[in-house]
Amino acid sequence: MSYNLPNPSLIGILLIISTHSGPQLIYKQPPGLTKEPDEDEGEYDQEDIAETESDEYGNYFEYDEDSNMYGTNLYKQWDANHLNYYMGTKKDLISFLDEIETKRKQASMKAVAKKRSQLSKIASNPSTISTTGNSGNDSIFGIEPAYLCEMLAPPKKMCNSRFEIMIDDKIFLGLPVHKYDNGSWRLKGSSKRINRNKEENTHQHEVDNSKSKLNLNMFHLVFIMNPPVIEYNYRIDEMFHYVISRLSLVLRYEQSKNDFISNQVKMILNLKEQFKEKEELESQLLNKSSLCKMIHDCYLSISQSKIANLSVNNKLRSFQIPIKTEFHSLPESSVPFIPGSHLSSTVGLLGTTGLINVGETTRYGEAMNDENEGISEAADDIVYFALLLLDDAESIIRDIKTESSGTLAKFIRMINPTESLLKLSTRSNSLDTLQVKSFAFHLIYWRRARVIQPLSTRSVYFVSPMAPITTNLYTDIREFKKSFPTLPSLPQFLKLLSPQSKKPSQFATVIPSKDHRDIYFEALSWLIRFGYVTQLQTFIWLKISRKIKIKVEEDLENESSSRKRSNITKKLLMGGTDNSSKDPAAESSTDNRIMDQNDDKEENATKQLSNINAEDQEIENIKERLKSTSLGPLVSLEDDDDTILLDPGRATTLERRWINKIIFDECKLSSELTNAFYKLLKYMDGKSPLELLLLKENISRTEIRKLLIAIEDHIISVRHW
């Protein structure tokens, strides 16, 4: 398993409330939470335990309890028809067997302890024999609901914050919402306002309670999870962040405004009084209670890693745990990922905006967290990109249940992977840039579109290193032939993009004629959608050679020495002069003495200047002698190696002098190329592709080509995805 693979580990949802009469369980989903999710009908006994201790690894798959290490059924995980079969590695198998051994021993000890505890309970209380059947049907994983409610209804001080408790290797995670002392479910913006309206709110709350006859103090939507041990923190954190916290706050808002939870709880309790049979009761709850229907839909969607479109008090809300199908760099060989994932450095630029959930490139590593200050700028950059629909336009319109003649439907039909969103907004009279960005964000969130650079015949495309050739190729060959019967087959098309004998070339060389342009772009869109092809992009760094650094160093030394020489001369010539007014009688009486002093100062200044010139001459002689020796080049304030500027857009004073030396002295760029150079400067960080520069800046390909030829000795260029 890996962080890149969806694994919600959700096995159930509980709704707990607390009133004056105490906590109670209102609803649970799924209804049958009395067994382990993958528990077999048979149980461990002493003979089975003895057999497993002497057996080899071949019988480990007989015990589904071992699958808790990975949170899935082992039959499914290692089945050739299952997705995870194609993602396994040698390291996966070794760690799998080691963890199975540990879990097997734990299961053996647990089975023995469980039988002993059951025997002791029966021996101490014989009456439990007759009641075991009834209580077992209502228990939740062997725990009595009343006892579980006491643990899942925390005190008031522990509410309105994250709640997490582990019971029998299962995580009960939630955000308990408790009402405040003033009767409100939400904190007001000002404490003075709370104090001023406290009596009024309390009175109104008492009136509401008398009408509703349900004094609801707390409600808690609890998610039951069994994540893998090695993914424990990651899985519960993403569940709480993306689903639990947001859904609980939405429910708190509806309870505060409309008493939504209170009214639904009353309805559920009434239905429980009317219908005693479980199947009929469950059917009535789903048909009549919108809260039960919401919990049911949430469990089904989130447990299957789908988007949960929930109706909360007749308002549509969407929740999901994002799936990682976007990668900015190639994952390690031992890191599994979803087949068909997209590989592009553009993901790294937009990953900080929240639009894209970037995949992990290392095994169980931390998520990429580039703390860029330009997050809002990166979000604005989306208008320069294009959208690639991940399904047919009409199918998307039907799935998201929007009006066929609505603005969103028109926008979806307008989307073309060859045009940027900015061009779409200028081409449409009814859509501005903000609306286009908003619609794009929604389609990306709903997993209906992907951000790409606009397709162009001048761009270069090649077979992605993450192409699902080993998993989906044979199926996709038929699908590609069905969608594009007049084009070459899928393997042949991929061979055209990435030939063995030469480098990949522009996409225009693949298209036979102008008449084939549209169909070839459609085929290219299909290949990018399913992860077979990605764009080849150009990245550059600005290189500062040792020669440039020595010249700048010499300029700095010359400036420093000339500055010191001028300062000394000023001090010697002007330091003893006194321009203050004096008594004429005193001046006439001391003229001879002042003239003698001035003569002495001029002589001293002449001597000091001659000494300075002698010292400068001696320094020059030392430099000449050092140059003539073999150790001369090593005597420098700078390193011998060249320097690569990682962020020339934020260059220091010294780095700016290096850059100016390249522009004006070494390359002697014209004014037009100098302006183009300064536009290109912030893209010389090895992270921003030049193709993005062409999209954002008002600069032509010809001008870029001339500039790169002029400064080719001072740049390092790399081409990759």
From Swiss-Prot:
Entry GO terms, CC: GATOR1 complex
One example of a Gene Ontology biological process annotation: positive regulation of autophagy
Name of the featured protein: Nitrogen permease regulator 3
Record bears the keyword DNA damage: no
Residues of the signal peptide: 1-21
Tagged with keyword S-adenosyl-L-methionine: no
Annotated source species: Scheffersomyces stipitis (strain ATCC 58785 / CBS 6054 / NBRC 10063 / NRRL Y-11545) (Yeast)
Pfam families cross-referenced by the UniProt entry: HTH_NPRL3, NPR3
Family matches, as PANTHER family: CGTHBA PROTEIN -14 GENE PROTEIN, GATOR COMPLEX PROTEIN NPRL3
